[in-house]
């Protein structure tokens, strides 16, 4: 199943090579993850979330699919109230990360720093509070720094 045109140009394959190597139980889920990752890189977050969600159906143990959902919600400056919080998705990724590569575990742990139940519960889209706490953003940035170096 493809949730988007199969000829969609995601740019240079080197931009999303990481996506082709994620820990995943089957190739159908991996192919959908690559599609989701491409949409994520192109800021097509709603389509990326739909594709990452399909990955969780194809492989419920794919921690990086849950990470992808949380990442799309947390990095989306055009956040829509219907997208919700990334807290529950990243907690699902945390619960599944044991079988992941070290890099995947580090990415999951870093993004988990950006979400809290308190921020999720305090979100109020009517006043543009999307549960995106500045202190949590700093914690995420600090957790990502060693991965960049």
Feature map (PLM): residue ranges:
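Asp-box/WD-like beta-propeller blade repeats and closely related beta-sheet repeat scaffolds
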Residues: 121-149
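Residue-level recognition of tetratricopeptide repeat
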Residues: 28, 62-63, 100
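Inter-helical turn/loop elements of alpha-helical hairpins
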Residues: 38-47, 69-101, 109-130
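N-terminal pre-domain segments of enzymes
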Residues: 1-27
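Conserved structural position within tetratricopeptide repeats
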Residues: 54-57, 95, 149
């Amino acid at each position: 199943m493809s949730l988007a045109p199969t000829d969609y140009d995601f740019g240079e394959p080197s931009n999303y090579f990481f996506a082709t190597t994620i820990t995943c139980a089957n190739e159908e889920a991996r192919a959908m993850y690559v599609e989701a990752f491409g949409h994520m890189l192109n800021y097509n977050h709603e389509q990326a979330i739909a594709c990452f969600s399909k990955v969780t159906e194809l492989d419920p143990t794919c921690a990086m699919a849950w990470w992808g959902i949380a990442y799309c919600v947390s990095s989306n400056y055009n956040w829509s109230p219907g997208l919700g919080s990334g807290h529950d998705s990243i907690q699902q990724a945390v619960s599944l990360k044991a079988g992941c590569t070290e890099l995947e575990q580090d990415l999951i742990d870093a993004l988990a720093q950006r979400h809290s139940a308190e921020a999720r519960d305090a979100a109020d889209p009517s006043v543009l509070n999307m549960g995106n706490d500045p202190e949590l953003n700093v914690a995420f940035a600090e957790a990502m720094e060693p991965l960049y170096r």
